[in-house]
Amino acid sequence: MLSRHIRELETELRVPLLYRNGRGVVMTQAGERLKQLGATIIRQIQDAQNQIRHLSPDYLDSASIGMPASVSAILLPPLARALRNAHADAELRFLDGCNGDLLNNLNAGSLNVALLYDAPGIAHPNLEAVLSQPLYLIEACPTASEAADIGATIEAAELAGIPLVLPGKRHGLRQIVASWANRNALDLTVQCECDSYSSMLQVVSSGMAATLLPAASLKREILSGYFRCRLITKPALYRTIALAASQSRPVNAGLVTQIKKMIETVRDDFLWPQLPANTQPNIRAIQTSSLNSALQTAEEIVF
């Protein structure tokens, strides 16, 4: 059967593809060239199949997802569990990092999806705001036995005299804080910079400096009396988390949907300690392009 097909090809192409002798067959130059072209065509077909298959929400062979460390502290465990349950054979990879690194990996195709701080100057064509969190002043507790006062507040003007440890200037959280401080004519004292989330918290625990983070990412430490938190008011300071998909590699629609659903599922965890409902910006009603200005307005109205 195979020999007949090869002879039909030779007849159609008008060139021998195999040199036949008593010891067997050897490919001619034309045969070698046809083999190379055929392999290229097969790879292209397989690539096309994979790209189309990625469009099915029920199929996921691999996923690389990036997010800031303070987001992964809340989202990663339930998200990883949900993805593993839904896609038992999928290769799952998670990456912590700052905005700049996550965005570079996203643009390079190393990540399928990333959760980013919607910071000033961030450039990506398909950012979608999915969550807004109020930031707190996070400090080491004077005594380990001190009861957690999760309702404590601090006015923005009082931050001026407090030494802070913050991420470097290329980090999205730092850009959000700097933009907020500039808008409100606040002069913050940055004692040192730490791009590593764990290193930043080590500085805080030493008592050398405080930091600005969502209380939710440190819930266990706050309730145990290791850290204390004070909600920043007059005006409030929010960070917005946005979802962005890669433009250079296929993105499974079902993956994006699952991430959004999981954020909704753990929304209360992200917003701990709960703020009154009327103080929480309605993310669903705000377009990404106008989100920052809307939050600025909310700062003045709420506090």
Q: What are these model-predicted stretches?
A:
Residues N126-K169, Y238-P250, E264-R267:
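Hydrophobic/proline-rich hinge and linker segments of small-molecule sensing/allosteric domains
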Residues Q36, T40-R43, L55, P78-A82, ...:
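Short beta-strand-centered segments that line the small-molecule binding cleft or hinge
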Residues E8-M27:
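A short LG(V/I)-centered, amphipathic sequence patch enriched
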Residues E12-L13, L34-S56, D269:
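Alpha-helical linker/hinge and terminal dimerization helices associated
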Residues L60-I122, C194, I301:
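Central regulatory/effector-binding core of bacterial HTH transcription factors
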Residues L75, R228-N282:
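A late-sequence structural motif
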Residues R4-H5, L79:
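Residues within the DNA-recognition helix of helix-turn-helix
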Residues I122-A129, Q133, S198-S248:
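Beta-alpha-beta core module
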